[in-house]
Amino acid sequence: MSDSPSISAEERKRILRERRAAKMAKGNATSRLNTILTQGNSVKDVSSVKSVLDQEPTGATATTTGNHDLDPDHHDIEGFINTPGINASNDSVALSNSEDIDEMFKKIFGGQVPGNGTDGAGSEDPLAQMMKMFSQPGAGTGTNTPFSEDPFSAQPEEFKYQQQLVQYNTYRHQVWKFRFLAVRYFALLANFIYHFYIIGDSISFASSSHQFIRELIPVEPARSFFTLFSTIEVVIIASYYFLGTKEGFFSTATSNNFVVKLLDMGSMVLPQLQQFKTIAVRLLGYYELLAVLLGDLSLVVVLFGLHSVLGN
């Protein structure tokens, strides 16, 4: 018996592995499996078993391609971006947003989209149209004006009607203001003539540089005059305020005020300025009432001056 060279354990395992792989490659894996299973079973039969090596691969087994790492460094999202369903939904969302913007511009500019090349309101610059809106009488006052409810949804006919309504309210305000002016001056002149010409004597109101002459002037006519004057002023100013609040005269009177227009333009950038506009309109209304009182007091000073000069 010839001596064979010594074989290491690793080499022996490799040779056995190669032999086993060669036998498996020849096929008949099922028969070999059944032979192994039936060894020593002389009494009980064992049903034939089919080896997995002889089974044909089916389409149910999905083959994975690409990155087999469970936690890859880079995620491939190209499939999600190029998915037809997602792209179609993104296109529909963008189209709906574009339609919403066009619809908004149509509402703002009376049915014409700015820059569409057609004649009319839409062909002008949007900034120029906005300045034109605020240059109209009664812009931004909030009562009896074309901007009181929703100016951007008004049609041209309705906008023209609102302009005519503002002009009519301005005319009515001027008429009532003239009526109150006539009543005030009539009441003031009647009060002055009654106290200093009818019931007063020749020195009822005389100007002099001498103190003893001024002390001879009776106090009763002047006191009664100012009492009646204060009563008439309170009644007239209260009536004017009530009528102005009911008919919206104060908002109409302040519609063309520079402060109100400046606050209207500023509120487009800072909506917080809207509350200051309400305060400004109220203060301008109070200023008009104060102007009524100051005008009547000025007339009283003029009448006293004329009487002191011409009454001697």
From Swiss-Prot:
Protein name (Swiss-Prot/TrEMBL): Golgi to ER traffic protein 2
Function statement: Required for the post-translational delivery of tail-anchored (TA) proteins to the endoplasmic reticulum. Together with GET1, acts as a membrane receptor for soluble GET3, which recognizes and selectively binds the transmembrane domain of TA proteins in the cytosol. The GET complex cooperates with the HDEL receptor ERD2 to mediate the ATP-dependent retrieval of resident ER proteins that contain a C-terminal H-D-E-L retention signal from the Golgi to the ER.
Lumenal side: 197-224, 310-312
Gene name in the database record: GET2
Pfam families: GET2
GO cellular component: endoplasmic reticulum membrane; GET complex; Golgi membrane
Protein location: Endoplasmic reticulum membrane; Golgi apparatus membrane
An annotated GO BP: protein insertion into ER membrane
Complex formation: Component of the Golgi to ER traffic (GET) complex, which is composed of GET1, GET2 and GET3. Within the complex, GET1 and GET2 form a heterotetramer which is stabilized by phosphatidylinositol binding and which binds to the GET3 homodimer.
Superkingdom of the source species: Eukaryota
InterPro entries: GET2, Get2/sif1
PANTHER family with a match to the protein in the record: GOLGI TO ER TRAFFIC PROTEIN 2 (PTHR28263:SF1)
Keywords per UniProt: Endoplasmic reticulum, ER-Golgi transport, Golgi apparatus, Membrane, Transmembrane, Transmembrane helix, Transport
Bilayer disposition of the protein: Multi-pass membrane protein
Organism: Scheffersomyces stipitis (strain ATCC 58785 / CBS 6054 / NBRC 10063 / NRRL Y-11545)
Homology family: Belongs to the GET2 family.
Record topology, Cytoplasmic segments: 1-175, 245-288
Transmembrane segments: 176-196, 225-244, 289-309
Signal sequence interval, chain numbering: none
